[in-house]
Amino acid sequence: MGVFGSNESSSMSIVMYPWLAFGHMTPFLHLSNKLAEKGHKIVFLLPKKALNQLEPLNLYPNLITFHTISIPQVKGLPPGAETNSDVPFFLTHLLAVAMDQTRPEVETIFRTIKPDLVFYDSAHWIPEIAKPIGAKTVCFNIVSAASIALSLVPSAEREVIDGKEMSGEELAKTPLGYPSSKVVLRPHEAKSLSFVWRKHEAIGSFFDGKVTAMRNCDAIAIRTCRETEGKFCDYISRQYSKPVYLTGPVLPGSQPNQPSLDPQWAEWLAKFNHGSVVFCAFGSQPVVNKIDQFQELCLGLESTGFPFLVAIKPPSGVSTVEEALPEGFKERVQGRGVVFGGWIQQPLVLNHPSVGCFVSHCGFGSMWESLMSDCQIVLVPQHGEQILNARLMTEEMEVAVEVEREKKGWFSRQSLENAVKSVMEEGSEIGEKVRKNHDKWRCVLTDSGFSDGYIDKFEQNLIELVKS
């Protein structure tokens, strides 16, 4: 075992092995930083390709050690593929096969390190190799508790007939005892979850792997808080008959050497009045696949009349966002609108005083960043988990509005314009209601002791688990 001893101030030896995606590795590293801050030692397993991107985020290099793992070449994957960034979505199951094939190397590492704790989320076989060396296992989930409760608990199992896709009505059914009638999917939205139960040769379904991962661990951990998702966490705990530990949002805190907002954006935003700019960002993955959908988004923001900044990947078929812009758009919005295809410092933009509205896809990280900001929130979720996050924010917390869309999944420029104006125009009843509710939640979530309190409790849970 590690150097963890009889008193609670001793250091635990921890191994982290997240799914091979930056959207998973980064939150795992943020949690590693929180635990290292308390003196615990972490060995972080990751592909070689991920090292350069994650190394700068390691705040405690004396306590967090990166250990690169060789990702085997699996037939059907692009040459050299190591993370989900290298792989189209429809081949993700082959990346899971490659991860499964790292088991012998990971087992050797475990035997050498003899950790007290192992954190994982996808590699369901981790408990099988951790138990013989006496290590406790924690399945750490970086998605919302609501999405787990709806689709990744034993009661959510679906009978899948080979070769037959389930209907939207079948996919939209909530499992027995599911604790909400509001945070649900409509049949046409639920189709985006069909991949969860789809069977693949060699690895079965995503559902099988994830349920096995949570069923066999010693404890489940979720990156959320009881104030927002308590009833979903309790439901998950009952479904698996084991403890569910909550870490809180685990967002990176301000650091002494944290960079300031890129001068390009700081200077541009400074030209506008307080709270007048609409900021639109849809995360690091391509979201808007068709040029006509991309153009509807641009035209909808133009028609609001507000200044706007958009950070979005180009749609399919073009290499830059400029190629996809509507005819005459750039000239019409010059001076008040920018569409940018690169990476942008989202938390810093949200905290700029000129920004008053955030149009988001409602990924879980963006959800927390929006809640902790002072911006009005407009949501354009794209698939299952994001839609559930949006329903949590609009139907239960009532802090945001969701853009109305057609059954085929996209929205019109008019529906986007209406949603933005409903929260930004003075005297709007909807705008006043969501701002009032958002202010209450922001006060709770940004309280100086809120996040620290969750990490303190989480650490105590881990200490008790290791001692048990």
Swiss-Prot record:
Gene name of this polypeptide: A3G2XYLT
Protein name, as recorded: Anthocyanidin 3-O-glucoside 2'''-O-xylosyltransferase
Keyword Transferase carried by entry: yes
Induction cue: By sucrose and cytokinin. Induced by jasmonic acid (JA) in a COI1- and brassinosteroids-dependent manner.
Residues binding UDP-alpha-D-xylose: 284, 344-346, 361-369, 383-386
Similarity section: Belongs to the UDP-glycosyltransferase family.
Disulfide bond residue pairs: none
Documented EC number(s): 2.4.2.51
CDD domains per record: GT1_Gtf-like
